[in-house]
Amino acid sequence: MSSKKFNQVDKGRGMISENYIEPAFLLPDLIEIQRSSFRWFLEEGLIEELNSFSPITDYTGKLELHFLGHNYKLKEPKYSVEEAKRRDSTYAVQMYVPTRLLNKETGDIKEQEVFIGDLPLMTDRGTFIINGAERVIVNQIVRSPGVYYKSEIDKNGRRTYSASLIPNRGAWLKFETDRNDLVWVRIDKTRKLSAQVLLKALGLSDNEIFDALRHPEYFQKTIEKEGQFSEEEALMELYRKLRPGEPPTVLGGQQLLDSRFFDPKRYDLGRVGRYKLNKKLRLSVPDTVRVLTSGDILAAVDYLINLEYDIGSIDDIDHLGNRRVRSVGELLQNQVRVGLNRLERIIRERMTVSDAEVLTPASLVNPKPLVAAIKEFFGSSQLSQFMDQTNPLAELTHKRRLSALGPGGLTRERAGFAVRDIHPSHYGRICPIETPEGPNAGLIGSLATHARVNQYGFLETPFRPVENGRVRFDQPAAYMTADEEDDLRVAPGDIPVDENGYIIGPQVPVRYRQEFSTTTPEQVDYVAVSPVQIVSVATSMIPFLEHDDANRALMGSNMQRQAVPLLKPERPLVGTGLEAQGARDSGMVIVSRTDGDVVYVDATEIRVRVSGQLPTASGKSTDNGQLTSQKGQEIRYTVSKYQRSNQDTCLNQKPLVRIGERVVAGQVLADGSSTEGGELALGQNIVVAYMPWEGYNYEDAILISERLVQDDIYTSIHIEKYEIEARQTKLGPEEITREIPNVGEDALRQLDEQGIIRIGAWVEAGDILVGKVTPKGESDQPPEEKLLRAIFGEKARDVRDNSLRVPNGEKGRVVDVRLFTREQGDELPPGANMVVRVYVAQKRKIQVGDKMAGRHGNKGIISRILPIEDMPYLPDGSPVDIVLNPLGVPSRMNVGQVFECLLGWAGHTLGVRFKITPFDEMYGEESSRRIVHGKLQEARDETGKDWVYNPDDPGKIMVYDGRTGEAFDRPVTIGVAYMLKLVHLVDDKIHARSTGPYSLVTQQPLGGKAQQGGQRFGEMEVWALEAFGAAYTLQELLTVKSDDMQGRNEALNAIVKGKAIPRPGTPESFKVLMRELQSLGLDIAVHKVETQADGSSLDVEVDLMADQLARRTPPRPTYESLSRESLDDDE
């Protein structure tokens, strides 16, 4: 199949009428959200923060320290991106700020550039390298600061209203009305206070208040009920409510009010909050005023009272006009503010303590607090995540993720249904499909393909203007936020349009004020630019998406991100046309930055001689540091080979161009992992049959042909990293050496003279990768060694083997060894003298137990691999590759897979590829079905094979059983599907344990593969054995095989010596339970009944804890635990 030449074929234009919007409205740069946000931080955010702290004065006011923020400098990074990854260090620049120290008494001015900390730099792929690992800062979606009105119905059925004034940081202010028509205010969720107290305390007179209100008569009731207050009384009352128990003063009240709402250090609406406040309350306060004004508070009260008269509207908190996105730049800015706050405190203290004459700016400024704040953010914030690098799509999606969790956001437990639900304002901004399954559903989303973030952090999406029923393709698309779009009638992107841009048909579906309705073409204001505008990048890769149920499309989107990069990537026969852009923006492929000629190509580098002037459009420095390239200059692109990704998959690039070839700017020069020809290629096109086969595809299981194993169709490379450090111990340094005690020469044959495995060696479980010995103390010595020493008086070498070995179930070839030592100037963790890293690569063929999936949420586990000759075969004798269960389609309602496999069959037969944009009804009714039938008919006509397509039984073919050669009873649906191998590989999951570690308290085996744990025999499994009456099996499971310490040692002893296994004792967890009950003060003990000699019975208490020796018995038998008698018994 691969030998055929596949041509790119567009939507079959001949068959379908010409009315369509060209779906190739180019997507924006898909990781622009990360880059532009970080650029904003460097150009504005950082300067803003530095300036807000300047000047810092000491408590006496004689010293002033000014930061000249706009002149800050960044020094060259210490290591390049590659070097930082190799050395496990951070790719960061040093920040220097010019400072000026002013002594007001003497008039001295000292100027100095001061180092204030390291700032991790974003790579051109939108990631950060922290301690050698690539990390991504996820965008957070939070409630926007501003004023929100909501209505509630109290228990008497009366409607009351409330207004919340939410700042970026500072105290909340909440106004509410009650059933007696009184207006109240709460400051920071404290006790209620009459609204007039606050207004009077602000210094407003009755006349000013009444003039500002539209319905002063409503407010009059509050004044009548409470009585008149003067400004002084109001301030006293305010102080009494906020600081109960302290003697109130007018001055105290004034200070309290000022610091709560009018001090820019304590209260900040932010640019966004001011914008939202002005917009909602129709104010015209300038953008620079970031604190509240008395006018804001009056206007807020006025709007609240107007709501009682049905003027104005209440807010929907889940509307995207009220939620904003905080990207890297802003999150980082908040963190820098935290660091600078700590720094300011330190500077003040130093100013007070030190002698003013000898002070210099450098001695005042300590970079530690700022460094710590930034480090903490990148290292341990919930929003700084280890990048998902399974494949290019996973990487791209991770950078476009929107999370409602994190600091200042929601928590999983508190988030209700409304927050998680799809909202009409998500259209074109947040994908309604791509979200995780499970507890995070709806809290973590993905940016839609065309969405972008505006200067205030609100999501915008583009629309084309429509005039009198005609779409204006000649005008640029207008980007609109959810607020702006609310009062417009907006049509979706898949409506039919004639060649002049006029909308066809009498009725058009539109969205208007959060409702979906229909209207005439003349009434439409805007139309979406593209049918895939509403979904995310991953979802837009699913062909025939419109025929899939949303739940399955969600699984399809999520599983494409888990596809493992294969050895021989192959792009899909049926794609959506967005694969190329997805691959390019993920940063996995190398893209030419200029026009030019290729002058040199090998496996590791490509050189291009520039033929034109490179525009400095972005002005953004790239990897190689050039901003502009002069004509005739050579640009070098490094091709990375077999690098390990964060998920242990293999990152490998291979050149696509030849020497002497002309390239244009933006052309793909080299493919990365999971790309072919510059297009995403996550899986393989394979021939599929939908039919049951001997029950091997029961419950979604998959039956595959041995061809997929033999021809390496689904073979992937995985690179594991093993690391060991030689530390300084109390008894001396650990050594990395070849001289390991009690290890034969055979085990050392692959090691070099240093004791490190050589590159290219094949290793299996238990093999030594790095030999290491640790000095051991007296107590570690077994008795026979003490004996030897007593006899010969010499010290046997006091070291024990502590080598790095290949863990259970792993094998592969050593591809790289890296050695880091203090002498070479490498930065090592404290206490380590040397670190050795070994990379082991393995080829994993597909096998039983691996998980496979299509793009439509059709996933399953491989249950059997059949020989090629036993697979069902087609009339021309070619066997199918995979057999899926037809019952997986009807109830799941993901019919897109059937369209895909049939169109794929036509493409396979014709030797062409199809690009089909989802939502294709704009090409006419039933257009998916028409193109599939048309192409199958064409395939039959071109090949002249009648069996390829039978119009009476469309899409089905007679198939023959490979074992008997007889035809199956009915024709079977055959096609070519694009199937992915997912990262859930059986090799990583299968696990067995004989003896291993035990939990300290309960003495039960640990759980999980990583801990070498056992299988949990839980409550329900115990019931099963009880039901069978298998008493001894059950007793054994609950004691000897689990947590009866003495019993398991004795049992092991007995098995080793072939004796009868003794009776089990008491489980440790029973003792723990007793102790816990005793600790609650309950006298609980174990009693046994003993029969006396005279036949009477006696109740005796048993002390389970008395057997101290049993508790000290080591978990594995050593020479000490074997008694003299038991050794004699052996003879």
UniProtKB/Swiss-Prot annotation:
InterPro entries listed in its UniProt record: DNA-dir_RNA_pol_bsu_ext_1_sf (IPR042107), DNA-dir_RNA_pol_bsu_external_1 (IPR019462), DNA-dir_RNA_pol_su2 (IPR015712), DNA-dir_RNAP_su2_dom (IPR007120), DNA-dir_RNAP_su2_hyb_sf (IPR037033), RNA_pol_bsu_bac (IPR010243), RNA_pol_bsu_CS (IPR007121), RNA_pol_bsu_protrusion (IPR007644)
Top enzyme class: transferase
The EC number(s) this enzyme carries: 2.7.7.6
GO molecular function, one term: DNA-directed RNA polymerase activity
Keywords from the named record: DNA-directed RNA polymerase, Nucleotidyltransferase, Transcription, Transferase
Entry keyword Nucleotidyltransferase: yes
Coiled coil: none
Biased composition range(s): Basic and acidic residues: 1122-1131
Catalytic function, reaction form: RNA(n) + a ribonucleoside 5'-triphosphate = RNA(n+1) + diphosphate
GO biological process, one term: DNA-templated transcription
Region (Disordered): 1108-1131
GO cellular component: DNA-directed RNA polymerase complex
Subunit relationships: In cyanobacteria the RNAP catalytic core is composed of 2 alpha, 1 beta, 1 beta', 1 gamma and 1 omega subunit. When a sigma factor is associated with the core the holoenzyme is formed, which can initiate transcription.
Family matches, as HAMAP family: RNApol_bact_RpoB
Similarity comment: family membership: Belongs to the RNA polymerase beta chain family.
Role of this protein: DNA-dependent RNA polymerase catalyzes the transcription of DNA into RNA using the four ribonucleoside triphosphates as substrates.
NCBIfam families xref list: PRK00405.1, rpoB
Name listed for the protein in its UniProt record: DNA-directed RNA polymerase subunit beta
